[in-house]
Amino acid sequence: MRRTCFETILSLQKKNKKIIFVGSDLGPGFMKHSKDKVPERFFMEGVSEQSIIGLSAGLALEGYTPFVNTIATFLTRRCFEQIVIDLCHIVIDLM
């Protein structure tokens, strides 16, 4: 399922220069292929889930469509405040 997700994002990135991938400390594996193909639109930000939400909010405000990926429990619990303040209060489109 992860492979299909990343392959789909890469396929979308090839068609749309505004699509950005933002991840948080995910293993290299098959993501290296995406990083090699579109390095300027591939960000792996380390263990900083709160930061990837803030980064993605800023990218969305500039007209990009960020796809955020990290471990689900960290995304929902560690950065709840950023999701509410950075995304929901200003109504940003984020994938």
Show the residue positions of the predicted features.
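Thiamine diphosphate
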Residues: 1-95
